[in-house]
Amino acid sequence: MKLFPPPKVSRTATGRLDTLAPLPLVVHQGLPRRLRNACTRFAARHEAVFITTRADLPRAIQLKLSGKHPGDEAHSLKITPNGVSITSSSESGLFRGLSTLSQMLRQAKSSIRCCEIKDVPDFANRGVMLDISRCKVPTLTTLKTLIEQFADLKYNQLQLYTEHTFAFTDHETVWRDASPLAASDILELQAHCQAHYIELVPNLNSFGHFERWLRHSEYHAYAECPDGFIHPLSGKPMPHGSTLRPTAASLDLVSRLYDEYLPLFDSKTVNIGGDEPWELGLGYSRRRCEREGKTKVYLDFLNRLQTLAKKKGRRTQFWGDIVLEDPASLTQLSTDATAMIWGYEAGHPFEHQCALMAEANVPFYVCPGTSSWNSLTGRLDNATKNLYEAASAGANHRATGYLVTDWGDHGHHQTLPVSYPGFVLGASASWNAASSVSRSLSQGINLVFLDRQAPALADRIVTMSRFPQLIKTKVVNATVFNHLLFWRMRHAPNWSSRISNVELE
């Protein structure tokens, strides 16, 4: 029997617990209402389990709040022939223990071997970020199902990466035909996350990656380069701007967006983005950047965004790529802002970047990825290394959190199951970085995402995600398969000539 994520300590004992006989779950009056509701869902999911208030039954599932467990989600679980006891100092710890027991019951044929588990996560904050701004916005049904599955994997945060896919009242031009989430949708997701002990953290890019707004003429006045720019990476002309000009008018626009968006969330944190302001210093702010330096101009506007969010009662998270380009700038950051260190390739210098943040006393998360985007089938070898390297570096330098990113670059062509391996691996790496689930990965996918109904499909998902390893030719942040299918046919990419027919066959 495998558990996802694997527990820190698990010891077997003699005897077995019969899982076919009726198994009462004791819900006493002292349990918080949210946990009692979770118990009701637990009983509905497991046929032999039923709810009772009687604490004197000889065989039962008992939940105990005790102050002996360090850490908010630390818990112990003990199984004997007479039942199960789950103990924690917090209701969230009891909920995580129920998640472990649920996985055990779903895998048991008729009984579970007696054992004792003692568990605590490596990272206090363990989240998933879903990209809902690159051509795919999941339905509410899909998002709710994912929330339940993420809770099963013991994630406790969720972010929905948003550029233009929220239905802001005064900005229909931006979100028309984009299937945006409405305010009522966010409230529904907030309630579902809260019920499953997940913090729904608002994520609204507020500086760069604003192209879905700035392409429209009525927003050109906010653009650093309203008539477009030459992309510094590709050298290709971009027809419209992607970065806000760092002005009071831009700040006022963002303030109005925050006023409508942030009150929908219970979280006191907001991810304001800030990554990849490609054309900053090439247009409106060119002279200022020449005088003061681009990093200083960037930091000034970033700090103003953080001050704005603070006035609205929110702490901020921001992508750390720009400040890491100039480590001396780390001393100029707001003390209550959290840097998000992102990198998606195996071998990304998480260790070095985490050390820089730690030395500057900047709170930070590590943010690896599922390696699903630009891939078609996934990149399992890269994802595994990337996710575990981030966890190792983050743990070494006391990162405050771990965020698994699932992007949709260039059209979001990957299907959702391509991301499943990364979700399972990320849960394992962030809860128990010393563990490995690589050999049982398909079992975890089948258990959590396919309800144990499709082991062959789970095997195929894992097999397909290993396809890129068969090709010697490598491309960064993508696969050959993806690039051969989606490329501008007038000009063959340089790397395509390196692929032999033998490799393709």
What do these predicted regions represent?
Residues F4, T100-F123, A151-Q159, E218, ...:
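Conserved oxyanion/phosphate-binding beta-strand-loop segments in alpha/beta enzyme cores
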Residues D56-P58, F166-T169, T173-W175, P327, ...:
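Beta-rich nucleic-acid/ligand-interaction surfaces
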Residues F123-G320, T331-Q332, T338, G394:
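Substrate-binding cleft of carbohydrate-active enzyme catalytic domains
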Residues F50-R54, P202, F318, V366:
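A structural preference for short, hydrophobic beta-strand core positions in alpha/beta folds
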Residues M1-R126, E389, H412, F449:
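Contiguous, structured surface segment used for ligand recognition
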Residues E91-G93, C135, H164-A167, S206-H209, ...:
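Solvent-exposed loop/turn segments at secondary-structure junctions
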Residues C115-S133, Y365-N374:
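N-terminal small/glycine-rich loop or linker at the start of catalytic domains
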Residues M1-P22, H28-Q29, R33-R36, E148, ...:
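Substrate-binding groove of N-acetylhexosamine-processing glycoside hydrolases
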